[in-house]
Amino acid sequence: FLLIDYIEKYYPELNLIGKFSKLSIIKNREYSKFKFNDQYRIFDNIITSRNISQPIDSPIDSLTMINHKVINPYKSGLALKMVDDFIGDQNVLKSIYEFSIDNKLISSDKTFIDVFYKNNGEKIAWFINYLKYDNIIDFSVKKIESIQNNHKFLIKNNSGISLPLKITLKDLNNKSETKWINQFKNDTIINVNSKNKIIINPDKYFSEYNFSNNYSSIEKIKKKTKFVLFRDFKNDLNNQLFYIPTFDYNLYDGLMPGFSFSNSTPIKRSFNYKFEPSYSTKQNELLGTINLKYTNYNSNKNNNLYSVNYFVGASTFHYKDDLSYNTFFPSIVLAFRDKDLRSNSRQILSMRYISVFREDNSNSIDYPNYNILNFKYISANSSVEKAFNFKSDFQINKDFIKSSITFNYRNYYKTNRQYNVRLFVGKFIKNNTKDDYFSFSSFRARDYLFSTNLLGRSENSGFYSQQYIGSEGGFKSKINYEYANDYIISLNSGITVWQWIEGYTGISAIKNLNEDLNFQYESGIRLNLFTDYFELY
């Protein structure tokens, strides 16, 4: 609060990024327009938009690191600034001074809130409640009637807390008038004369679920669409389309330059879209992906449900030379996390319906088009020293039903030393397939769901066939029993030998229909140059 007050008085024009805001390449971007004091509400908005904020009066030992060190102090400063603006007469500063004197060289039983309440009484009862509030806040305003110079606006409180609400009224000459609505809880209609625009919570003293509904005018506000290179912060008065140049590659499409178009900003919003068109230099065709996502965060933090996500996605690329594929995959994902936000425990329950349409070749393929209903459960708990992951997968198709579980454990038992263990168990409950296209793979990723970035997905030999994806059997070596159409049990492990050099081993039990159980074994050296991104076996 004191820093906000100091900057406001002595450096009101200080930009958040200082002199860099004047650089020609960024001077028109939203973040270059932010003042120094805007950082407090920006960081608060970023965390609140992810549904991981915590009440200001939470005990320190219950706060996450980011909330303890950054967000809650920022929110506290903004809250005191709102009280100071609402009450006036420098009441906050006087209470801070009194509290400092009472605690000079001695320890007093009185908290700052005790002193503040003593000096202001019931005028700040709402403030005490705000410190404890742990839910979404959202106010909105819209015009409901306009007769000559008399206009009526409806202000709605879409949350369950009573707060004083600051509003700014502007006329045609852009002259502004500010007033407060005291203890705002229920919906309110206000009459405005000779003003043509109203803004609620103009200083953004508290984070809201949606700031775009904080503006209204006697005339319909026409938002312009702006194309913005790279991501930026949201401008509530414009529709922004962010675009980023992209370059992708696979063996059949060649180099694919393109663009990624999205509405994603650092402050998350409920609905996000991403279009990624690209041009195949090898096929001379326009390809790409489209993804739509709607996130509904659970405002009730007394249960473990964190969010519900709705996805719709589609893509088109080539799986062989001159043979294209198209996918369509709607899904619902339920995300769970511990009520103790400091816990790293996460759970995900998802349901996907994947439709694949493959261009047929002259030799014909048994499954050019197919649909799979996929259920997945993931439980993970990771820390700096240890990482645990459990995944259960269940797939249903008209010709097969298969289920699998995967267990991963990684332990950094010393500096730059680790060991890891992975167990995979997969079983066909029903299998009427004609070939091994949907079978469990012992050493190659069978990406018939087209969800993995394989550079040469149809290659059986050569450099591109050696791309390793840790799935199913998880073997790095090519073995005689490539597939399992009944069940497979695979155990893989590794341990650090020296710095980024590791030894690995694996053993697998592979069972095919009408064949005896077969055991396979492997061992070798892993060059762990960049974990999970660049490794050589």
Where on the chain are the PLM-derived regions?
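Hydrophobic alpha-helical and helix-loop surface patches within well-folded domains
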Residues: 1-157, 162, 172-177
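C-terminal outer-membrane beta-barrel translocator/porin domains of Gram-negative envelope proteins
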Residues: 12, 309-320, 327-333, 359, ...
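Solvent-exposed beta-strand/loop surfaces of large extracellular or lumenal domains
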Residues: 164, 168-188
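Transmembrane beta-strand segments that form the barrel wall of outer-membrane beta-barrel proteins
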Residues: 177, 181-183, 239-251, 257-259, ...
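Outer-membrane beta-barrel initiation region
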Residues: 182, 188-194, 199-304, 333-335, ...
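C-terminal beta-signal and terminal closure region of outer-membrane beta-barrel proteins
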Residues: 455, 516-537
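Conserved C-terminal beta-signal and adjacent last beta-strands/turns
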Residues: 489-497, 504-507, 523-531
